[in-house]
């Protein structure tokens, strides 16, 4: 049985670093990699890839763009991981990142979570606490945080 590893991407260029860490610390044949991207429900049309209707494109242009970007980011990550020989699955979640990551990690009974870190100043951390810190406080599995600046 393959050990599940959750890679929480955000669709930014920092996601490439998370995939590099997965390649470095995980092995095909030993780990199944699960890519998760959480999208704010105000800017999401669905929890997965599906055709976006003309109505949605006209009435919700920001959500349409966000949905397309999220789907493309997950698909690109999966292509890269599969090309490296990993069994992998992807998921979009309409939720705040902490809730989405914690619930998916619990559902999968993850052996590891790989997550990024935003480098905020003190005021930024006070106003918008770290997602990675919140995840670490709520899960029972190890969390590998990519603290490299992109």
Language-model-detected regions and their locations in the chain:
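Small/aliphatic-rich secondary-structure junction motif
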Residues: 1-57, 86
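Structural beta-alpha unit
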Residues: 76-113, 150
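Short, hinge-like loop/turn segments at secondary-structure boundaries
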Residues: 50-54, 107-109, 131-132
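Conserved beta-strand positions in the Rossmann-like core of class I SAM-dependent methyltransferases
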Residues: 34, 89, 144
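Short, flexible loop segments at boundaries between secondary-structure elements
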Residues: 141-150
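A short acidic, glycine-rich active-site loop
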Residues: 55-72
């Amino acid at each position: 049985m393959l050990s599940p590893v959750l890679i929480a991407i955000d669709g930014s260029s920092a996601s490439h670093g998370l995939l590099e860490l997965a390649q470095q610390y995980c092995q095909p044949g030993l780990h199944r990699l699960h890519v998760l991207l959480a999208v704010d429900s105000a800017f999401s049309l669905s929890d997965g890839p599906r055709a976006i209707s003309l109505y949605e494109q006209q009435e919700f242009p920001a959500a349409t763009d966000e949905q397309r970007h999220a789907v493309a980011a997950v698909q690109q990550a999966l292509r890269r991981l599969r090309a490296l020989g990993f069994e992998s699955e992807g998921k979009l979640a309409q939720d705040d990142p902490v809730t989405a990551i914690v619930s998916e990690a619990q559902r999968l009974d993850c052996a590891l979570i790989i997550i990024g870190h935003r480098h905020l100043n003190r005021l930024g951390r006070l106003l918008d606490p770290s997602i990675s810190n919140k995840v670490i406080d709520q899960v029972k599995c190890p969390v590998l945080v990519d603290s490299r600046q992109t």
